[in-house]
Amino acid sequence: TTEMLQFDPAGYSLKHYQDFFNNDEWQRSFWNSLIIAPIATIISVTLGTLAAIGLSQSHVPAKRAIMAILISPMIVPLIISATGMFFFYSSMGNFMEDTLGMDKNFVGYVKVVLAHAVLGIPFVIITVTATLVGFDSSLTRAAANMGANPVTTFFRVQMPLIFPGVVSGGLFAFITSFDEVVVVMFIGSASQKTLPWQMFIGLREQISPTILAVATILVCISVALLMTLELLRRRSERLRGITPG
């Protein structure tokens, strides 16, 4: 409308933020993002950390080839990854619904979560691998000599030292999932509509300042996460005995 596109506005107002919090469509998509992103992040952190630790071992063959395959989702254009995921998860979804009798809505969430986890794993692998570069492997051997099993060694020796890298990778994975729109449009349905998807629909179907209000909220979330990353980086440097410049 003419009033909607009029600048300068009549006055400062928070009504578009109120529209975001009071509108059912915006809130449904927001909560979908809050459900999907954390679960995808947990999967990414778990698998990515294990992969990084495994690839850090000297006896693993073809480490470069394996690493290239694992980080390929970050390198390959997203539209290509989304197309491949569409065919793969379509077959998987049909199997889960027809053979296992699972609910269609639940299967949709599973597909989106797994797809976002795949996109987040490369970030976790890279950050944890970078942290492991300065890790003294003699600590794990000493723990084994003292009778600690591999699980105890990981949680009591390795994890405290690589924790900043794990959290950094998790934050990158969370941001990737929370801001992703292409893959979820390929493999998701209306029930799994996320916040970026809702913003994309809003840009196509209407011109509303509510979209700008939502974008501002997302920017604030991203800035907060980046500040957390910087604090973790400084903590990691202190643990390694490096003085920040």
Regions found by a protein language model. Give the residues of each.
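Extracytoplasmic catalytic/substrate-binding loops of multi-pass membrane glycan-assembly enzymes
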Residues: 7-14, 191-194
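Short glycine/proline-centered loop/turn elements that form peptide/ligand docking sites
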Residues: 135-139, 238
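Glycine/proline-centered hinge or cleavage motifs at structural transition points of membrane proteins
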Residues: 146-147, 160
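Short cytosolic juxtamembrane segments of multi-pass membrane proteins
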Residues: 233-245
